[in-house]
Amino acid sequence: PGSGVVAWPASALLTGNGVALITRVPGTEHGDWLSTRGWYVFAATAALSVRSKYVIRLGDRPLFNPSNLGLVLAFLILGSGIADPQDLWWGQPSVGLTVTYAVIAAGGLVITARLGLLRISLIFWSVFASLTGIAAALGHDITARWSLGPVSGWTYWSTVTLSPEVLIFLFFMITDPRTVARGRRGAELYAIAVATIGALLVSMQTTEFATKVALLTALVIVCGLRPAIEACGDRPGRIAMVALPVVSVTVVLLAAPRQAS
């Protein structure tokens, strides 16, 4: 105050970019990158996200990942007719899609490695991919607007675990330094929890929209449990006591897959 210096709103821009990367307004034509259709959805979601950063706090940090919380609330309140996460499937293999994967992967690996958070992304993906593989092997499938029939088997697994949208989630959302559980062991338990709860919630869904929202919701739940996760992380023996039963129960629940009608 009174310094005459205008601060660059880097944090708000990052939150807004997170909202923009994930959100899609139905009816927008593919390739119309400069469309202003549904601009108020983006603006309201970004504003809610930024506001939550300063209102819902635990000590000196926000309790929830701001863009993640804003997105989940927007999707649940507005529904798929007004606000929809980007499709999990981004099209047939092409030069453009290859470049997209390369940019996301290279950027994610470099940034998370420099922040010392790469292990969180790797642990999350390993657990999530394994549990999702169990669901796929047991026959779980979903409906999607880009598929004429149910998405199942290898197609289901690869679409859910290797989607550019999921890569954005694991590289740039769950690794937010301000909302990751503190401590090495706490951070690892945090990654396992997001992956396990995410896989469980995803296995209960039969539509692509619900699948995407379920994964995002898992991070909201785990961030809310962060104090307990950090407490467990402070005592190494508790990690196995908590993580193994949770993963085991999840595997059992995955054994009863839901199929799209």
Q: What does each of the following model-derived ranges do?
A:
Residues 67-72, 121-130, 186-196:
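Central hydrophobic cores of alpha-helical transmembrane segments
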Residues 45-55, 71-76, 104-107, 127-132, ...:
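Alpha-helical transmembrane segments and their membrane-interface exit regions
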Residues 3-94:
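Membrane-interface helix-loop-helix junctions at boundaries between adjacent transmembrane segments
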Residues 39, 92-99, 120-121, 157-163, ...:
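Loop-to-transmembrane alpha-helix initiation sites
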Residues 78-137:
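Internal active-site segments that recognize and position negatively charged phosphoryl groups
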Residues 238-258:
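Internal/C-terminal transmembrane anchor helices
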Residues 140-205:
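Glycine/small-residue-rich hydrophobic helix-like segments
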Residues 1-4, 48-62, 105-117, 170-181, ...:
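C-terminal ends of transmembrane helices
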